[in-house]
């Protein structure tokens, strides 16, 4: 194996699909995969403008395409996969990143909210796996990555349904690792802590909430989308070729703090 960083962490020749790729962590991960040499399909809801994000990558000289896709809609998910295969003939890496925190303490529809998060964080990921794992395996193997959360590893006062469904999708990644490892597919979950994005603004933009969280974070700061994207490139590249069935925590040490 070539141990030079530009080879060890290269995704050249790969085709990657990133869901929830129009903004935030998903967009940073798509950009990092493209910079590492992958051809990237950026999928997202219409209001996140995945086509615009892809167009910016193309302007920079990368190969990318944007697809409007609600991953909870089976027909749209099938179209996403077929569009990718028709365009580039293969799939090597999946990052199932689409997500939403819909919990609202005291809400009368708490169970309905949990159902919606289950559909997004678990069922949609399972459906994407069903559509893409055979393609990845037939192409010689690759990486199926699931964006989980620190909330799936800790008890939560507020993010109850979010934490439950994120814990479930990390388990789904472990199951895929066992079921598909013999065909060359690696599956891992990634669990970010608080990352400075619009999604985390209720914590990062609230002085009291931010201070309370940082007291529990040994590194004393919030993470950046690029720091999550670095792990995605690692797991998709030759550098991550012997890593599977893991839940990679990127939280500045919050989980292990006393």
Place the predicted regions along the sequence by residue:
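Short C-terminal tail/terminal secondary-structure segment
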Residues: 2-8, 154, 232-233, 244-258
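Conserved glycine-rich cofactor-binding loop
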Residues: 15, 22-24
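Short, small/polar-rich loop/turn modules that mediate ligand/substrate recognition or access, typified
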Residues: 95, 141, 181, 186, ...
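Substrate-binding pocket helix/loop in short-chain dehydrogenase/reductase
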Residues: 105-118, 213
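Active-site helix of classical SDR
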Residues: 129, 165, 173
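Alpha-helical segment proximal to the catalytic Tyr-Lys
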Residues: 134, 178-182, 241
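Residue(s) in the substrate-gating loop at a strand-loop-helix junction
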Residues: 149
């Amino acid at each position: 194996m070539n141990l030079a960083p530009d080879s060890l962490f290269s995704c050249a020749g790969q085709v990657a699909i990133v869901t929830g790729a129009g903004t935030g962590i998903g967009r940073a991960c798509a950009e990092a995969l493209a910079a590492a040499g992958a051809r990237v399909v950026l999928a997202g809801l219409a209001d996140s403008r995945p086509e615009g994000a892809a167009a910016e990558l193309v302007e920079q000289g990368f190969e990318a395409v944007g697809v409007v896709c609600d991953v909870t809609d089976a027909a749209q998910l099938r179209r996403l996969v077929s569009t990718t295969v028709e365009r580039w003939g293969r799939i090597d890496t999946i990052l199932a990143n689409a997500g939403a925190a819909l919990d609202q303490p005291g809400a009368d529809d708490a169970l309905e909210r949990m159902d919606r998060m289950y559909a997004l964080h678990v069922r949609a990921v399972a459906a994407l796996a069903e559509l893409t794992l055979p393609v990845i395996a037939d192409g010689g193997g690759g990486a199926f990555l699931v964006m989980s959360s620190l909330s799936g590893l800790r008890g939560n006062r507020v993010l109850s349904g979010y934490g439950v469904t994120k814990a479930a999708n990390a388990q789904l990644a472990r199951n895929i690792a066992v079921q598909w490892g013999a065909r060359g597919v690696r599956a891992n979950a990634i669990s970010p802590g608080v990352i400075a994005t619009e999604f985390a603004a209720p914590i990062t933009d609230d002085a009291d909430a931010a201070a309370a969280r940082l007291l529990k974070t040994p590194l004393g700061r919030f993470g950046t989308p690029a720091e999550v994207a670095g792990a995605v490139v690692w797991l998709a590249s030759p550098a991550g070729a012997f890593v599977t069935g893991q839940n990679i925590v990127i939280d500045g040490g919050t989980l292990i703090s006393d």
